[in-house]
Amino acid sequence: VFTLDGADAKDLDDAISISRDGDGYILGVHIADVSHYVRPGSELDREAMRRGTSVYVTDRVVPMLPRPISNGICSLTAGVDRLTVSAIMHIDAQGRTVRSELHRSVIHSRLRGVYGELNDVIARGAESEYAEKYSVLGESLTCAQELYSILLDASGRRGALDMETDEARIILDENGAPRDIVLVERGTAERMIEQFMLAANEAVAQTLRTAGMPCVYRIHEDPSPEKMQAFSVFAHNLGLDITPLRGDRVTPAALSAVLAEAERRGIGSVVSVVLLRSLMKARY
């Protein structure tokens, strides 16, 4: 079991475990069990409900829960036991979740991983200055990379949209004044965790649906014909092949095909932004 977050993260609220299972894998996503410490109707619960979320600004965090909880007892610190809720997924070689289970659990993280460090290990292998640190993961790291690739391929076959948009980070000086704005780079490590969290979300949603329990779902409706027509004109003017966009209903696979061509031609970012604005807003 290990965590993987940004270098500045203080509240480590999720961890993963992974092992080989025949031709497939067993993926565990472990989320800090805040409900063990924050009881329904308590003062902490009411204050958390009032705040709604933790607010992340440039150089600080206004937490939803007191720091001794979010950064302390509920942070999945390496080397100590922590209470979690775990989604255990059995995933086959085609990226299909064939079985999943949800459990209250106790985990003991072996490593506090950092995105940038792991990206360096993935890129440079044994030559990375972080190779020794991540060697404790053994075959788990190999399995994680293999499963990430499998899930990504499965997502592509389903026609899932992978829209990369640039995220900016403001660099402050010692007085708290902005001195630079840089683009945040997303590497394999970030995308790998994203895929694993999506798999866990789908497993939880499927479990609740099967049990007939009420649940809030995030829904993206089909884009309007007018917005798709405008996007088609935009893409055509850039010289992109819009053949996949013709028809009565534009599918995610069709949009993915246009995005893929845009990426190959080095204009993926701008096309992703325009496409994002053409899609319907999510509703719950």
Language-model segments: which ranges?
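Conserved, carboxylate-rich catalytic/transport cores that coordinate ions
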Residues: 1-284
